[in-house]
Amino acid sequence: MSGESGFKNKSISEIVKEIYENIDGMTMSGKKDGNSNIGGFIATRHKEWYDKASIVNIIYEGYVTYGGMTGRDMGAMAQGLNESMDFEYLKSRCKQVEYLANKLDKYGVPFQRPFGEHALFIDAKKILGHIPIDDLIAQTLAIEIYLEGGVGSVEIGTLLADRDPITQEN
């Protein structure tokens, strides 16, 4: 793994802390590399943003102190976040995605580059171009990957992004 030379002797938690000290706000799903089965969070340093987000949170998720999560789930997410900052864990995750990228390259499967640490985005339209967009190409690919190999994946695009609010087209 490579990185910026100024961070060479810093721990993952020190790097994360420095990144977060320089942001105005963020969202995170604990189900990605937060190693949690549920949950996520919104953080901001702006009281006005917090107040607006709190209203929506209370309506849809629960009170701001727990966001609809049980104490057990909050504890699991906290533990998962700590574990996900372990260098060996992160190196392993990066190697897994790199392994997948190499296999896809070997078989000529098109994907976006550069790929990330926890995900790789396959270009479903290039693989299944004969399927009309309205028939949800990426959903079809995700389902077929699961049926064929038991590998869970998710569509990011046509269905997730929803239709254009004006034209109603994908």
From Swiss-Prot:
Its cofactor is pyridoxal 5'-phosphate. Keywords: Pyridoxal phosphate. It comes from the Eukaryota. Pfam families: Beta_elim_lyase. InterPro entries: ArAA_b-elim_lyase/Thr_aldolase (IPR001597), PyrdxlP-dep_Trfase (IPR015424), PyrdxlP-dep_Trfase_small (IPR015422). The keyword Transmembrane helix does not apply. The modification N6-(pyridoxal phosphate)lysine is found at residue 32. GO terms for biological process: amino acid metabolic process. GO terms for molecular function: lyase activity. Belongs to the beta-eliminating lyase family. This is Putative beta-eliminating lyase-like protein. It comes from Dictyostelium discoideum (Social amoeba).
